[in-house]
């Protein structure tokens, strides 16, 4: 008769797949000739005590994604208080708003948190400016994460001088190498499964392993398709020092997502998402993984034929930008990339709902972030014990 440990190991091997080559990487993500402790069968010892938990003083190797319009103080503080690292999604927040949000988070937790910035130009102008960096330094933020493009070396140096660590979300090995050359402290390897704005064309685990090999000894986290404890275990066994979790965190009580958005996530199945450039008068021509709604199906392959919005076009809804600070009313144009929040009204069938391809199929409920994190970590711990 098989023992519970044997069954757990068999379950994990099934999840890994025969071709995953998981034993090629150790717990540190180093090549197999540099692996640290291993068991009597030659398997690397992997646990939830990772470089991320040790260097950043957190209980869990868990980071909530800095999702624009969704990852506001309630979610960030909930994750930080649960022993992970909560990330504020700054998106298009202006510097005064960023400052207020950071202070709100600081008043709600003594845990670890950071700020995610988009380094790119939007229809509103540059999403991130020197003033945003100044705010982070003045507020003594301990972690800043950049998305889309690698920031200037001057920003990284300024943040480092202010005692802040800097990460880069990377969609490719080349971008990871560029970021490391610029001086970042860690890479979030974003696989193509990840929801939202995402330029990656490589699945999460293969990308993770390639990035680890390319940028060693820089710390690397896994992103894309992570919604369960088994996903966490798989990422750690392939060398990740932590996980970056987005879609699962949208389906939390603290996420600032409209109830209709959360409902649609729970009801998604099959080929639930698609990558499109249809959405985004506010941020045009950027690949965006969203739920595959009827609208997304209709425009698939014809995104280039969508005309720019005109003043006479009927809007698809109304919402509020900077909802926790400045509260600016906003009329949503057709194909708006602004995510539906509790302040949003209008035609939801015409809106975009960012979602990860694999994660969305694993969602079963909306619960407090702390419960989800504890469950994922407990399940991952059980699987890793079975593996070891």
Language-model region placement:
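Secretory targeting and sorting signals
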Residues: 17-28
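C-terminal segment of N-terminal export signals and the immediately downstream linker at the start
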Residues: 26-46
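Conserved active-site-proximal phosphate/metal-binding subdomains
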Residues: 194-197, 202-219, 227-388
């Amino acid at each position: 008769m098989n023992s519970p440990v044997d069954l757990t190991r068999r379950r994990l091997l099934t999840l890994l797949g025969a071709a995953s080559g998981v034993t090629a990487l150790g717990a540190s993500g180093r090549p197999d000739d540099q692996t640290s402790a291993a068991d009597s069968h030659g398997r690397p010892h992997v646990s939830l005590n990772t470089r991320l938990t040790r260097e950043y003083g957190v209980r869990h190797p868990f980071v909530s994604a800095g999702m624009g319009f969704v990852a506001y103080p309630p979610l960030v503080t909930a994750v930080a208080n649960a022993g992970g690292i909560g990330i504020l999604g700054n998106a298009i927040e202006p510097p005064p708003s960023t400052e207020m949000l950071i202070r709100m988070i600081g008043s709600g937790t003594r845990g670890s948190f950071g700020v995610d910035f988009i380094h790119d130009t939007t229809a509103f102008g540059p999403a991130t400016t020197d003033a945003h960096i100044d705010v982070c330094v003045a507020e003594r933020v301990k972690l800043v994460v950049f998305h889309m493009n690698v920031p200037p070396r001057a920003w990284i140096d300024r943040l480092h001088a202010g005692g802040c660590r800097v990460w880069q979300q990377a969609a490719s090995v080349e971008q990871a190498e560029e970021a490391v050359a610029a001086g970042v402290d860690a890479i979030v390897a974003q696989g193509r499964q990840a929801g939202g704005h995402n330029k990656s064309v490589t699945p999460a685990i293969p990308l993770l392993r390639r990035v680890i090999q390319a940028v060693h000894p820089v710390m690397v986290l896994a992103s894309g398709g992570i919604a369960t404890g088994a996903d966490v275990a798989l990422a750690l066994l392939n060398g990740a020092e932590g996980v970056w979790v987005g879609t699962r965190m949208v389906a939390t009580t603290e996420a600032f997502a409209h109830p209709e958005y959360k409902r649609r996530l729970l009801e998604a199945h099959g080929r639930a998402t698609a990558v499109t450039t249809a959405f985004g008068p506010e941020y045009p021509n950027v690949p965006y993984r969203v739920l595959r709604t009827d609208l997304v199906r209709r425009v698939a392959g014809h995104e280039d034929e969508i005309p720019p919005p005109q003043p006479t076009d009927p809007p698809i809804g109304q919402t509020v930008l900077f909802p926790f600070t400045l509260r600016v009313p906003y009329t949503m144009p057709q194909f708006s990339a602004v995510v539906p929040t509790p302040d949003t009204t209008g035609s939801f069938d015409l809106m975009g709902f960012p979602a990860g391809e694999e994660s969305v199929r694993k969602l079963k409920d909306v619960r407090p972030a702390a419960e989800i994190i504890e469950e994922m970590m407990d399940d991952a711990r059980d699987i890793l014990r079975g593996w070891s």
